[in-house]
Amino acid sequence: MPLFSILTLFPDAVEPYLGASILGIAREKGLADYRCVDFRDFARDRHRTVDDRPFGGGPGMVLRPEPIAACVEWLEREHGPFRKLALCPAGTPFRQPLAEELSKTERVLLLCGRYEGYDQRLLDELAFETVSLGDYVLSGGELGAMAITEAAVRLIPGVLGDDRSANEDSFHGGGGLDHPHYTRPRVWREREVPRVLFSGNHESIREWRAERAQERTIERRPDLADNDN
């Protein structure tokens, strides 16, 4: 059963999400488990200090390496080696292929940054991969860690009610965007569902969906369309 361990200064912000919706269902089914650890608990001084001023000057504070390293090493003694990812705006963009990899990984550790970021020696010493959700900056990595966990866990067979849901998502297999979806009523505010979708002709429906997905990808994400060629 895959274990996702999230290292954060704000476990109370993360733990409720891990017990809700798809993530909670996966845990109840015994298909995934989570551990949320406050790395401040591994600070050695009486003030439980986890940050300090940056060498070379500049604004903000930098996370010290010692408490985080102690936390990671304790977890690896408890459970064994983890694949370690640090959330960081300067990291590699998170994409669906990585979610697919993580869904098949036995132990994943997600480190949530704060302040100006991490001491680089920590990332180098413990062989962290750095991952970013996008070209913007948040105050911490907690939202990113929760997003990555859900993106991976929902791909584990048996988590979703129908495994085809994950196989037909946008980006599956490194592909393009998903096609438009419709449900009842057939007409809403004079907007009608495309007739092909209730024609009963499954081949025509597949072709229509593939064409609409390609059109949407070219319009909204031409970079993905280029990758498909």
Say what each PLM segment does.
Residues 2-41:
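Glycine-rich, flexible N-terminal cofactor/catalytic loop recognition
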Residues 118, 122-167, 171:
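Structured adenosyl-cofactor binding patch, chiefly the S-adenosyl-L-methionine
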Residues 5-7, 35-37, 83-85, 108-109, ...:
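Hydrophobic/aromatic beta-strand patches that form the interior of the parallel beta-sheet core
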Residues 172-228:
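Long, charged alpha-helical interface segments
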Residues 64-114, 120:
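S-adenosyl-L-methionine/SAH cofactor-binding core of RNA-modifying enzymes
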Residues 43-46, 51, 55-69:
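A short aromatic-anchored loop/beta-hairpin motif
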